[in-house]
Amino acid sequence: MLPSTSLSSSMHGNGVLNSRDAARHTAGAKRYKYLRRLFRFRQMDFEFAAWQMLYLFTSPQRVYRNFHYRKQTKDQWARDDPAFLVLLSIWLCVSTIGFGFVLDMGFFETIKLLLWVVFIDCVGVGLLISTLMWFVSNKYLVKRQSRDYDVEWGYAFDVHLNAFYPLLVILHFIQLFFINHVILTDTFIGYLVGNTLWLIAVGYYIYVTFLGYSALPFLKNTVILLYPFAPLMVLYGLSLALGWNFTHTLCSFYKYRVK
């Protein structure tokens, strides 16, 4: 479920597993422990999870320094406490209900939108992105001298959650206060404000993702994860020149979903 360290580089003759095999051997147990804690709220540290959410905005490097500390104390990089995931889910539900209210949706339309956003936009897309990043990082970014190390899928999912939270707050919460009276007014100021919020949100996602993988000492060339900034800036400039309002497109898509 998480990046692992090595005690030996290969299978010994006496049958002892190398670190990569050992990590995979225990991954199932760690996943089971994590999922089991999802239903034990008293064991979750919500205060610490809230602290992480704050610092993902103000100083995301501090969040990943804590990941290093966890590796040293618990011998794992990924979170073993699902409190962050629970708080993120609450944020997602509340902000989606707010979207339904702003777009003047009925009760059942809002519930349908909520199910779409949670299970498709968050969980489905999150699983897809995490799996892609897990594959790419293990295939192309692991240092040659560190082949006994690997990025486990669970850590890739944690990085996605970290990067998704600022994007969620910007696009699903802050943006709500500007949608009807500014962003959807079909003026230059409208799509300037809306598209700038999209630029900041997606930029945050790219940057926090980069920090997550650059925090792993056995990966190389993680700077390539910043390359999407270039096409993002080009797309932003084109959207302003062509009058393409990203938020208007999103709202139309949400309304189409719940028909």
Curated annotation (Swiss-Prot):
UniProt tissue specificity: Highly expressed in periodontal ligament and bone marrow, but not in gingival fibroblasts.
Membrane topology term: Multi-pass membrane protein
Entry's Gene Ontology BP terms: protein localization to cell surface
Sequence ranges on the Cytoplasmic membrane side: 1-82, 134-163, 209-222
One Gene Ontology CC term in the entry: Golgi apparatus
Lumenal side: 104-112, 185-187, 244-259
InterPro entries: UNC-50 (IPR007881)
Positions where N-acetylmethionine occurs in the chain: 1
Residues passing through the membrane, by range: 83-103, 113-133, 164-184, 188-208, 223-243
Keyword Coiled coil applies: no
Compartments reported by the entry: Nucleus inner membrane; Golgi apparatus membrane
Keyword Acetylation in record: yes
Modification Phosphoserine occurs at: 6
Keywords: Acetylation, Golgi apparatus, Membrane, Nucleus, Phosphoprotein, RNA-binding, Transmembrane, Transmembrane helix
Range of residues in the leader sequence: none
Example of a GO MF term: RNA binding
Family note: Belongs to the unc-50 family.
Function (record text): Involved in the cell surface expression of neuronal nicotinic receptors. Binds RNA.
Name of the protein described by the UniProt record: Protein unc-50 homolog
Lineage of source species: Eukaryota, Metazoa, Chordata, Craniata, Vertebrata
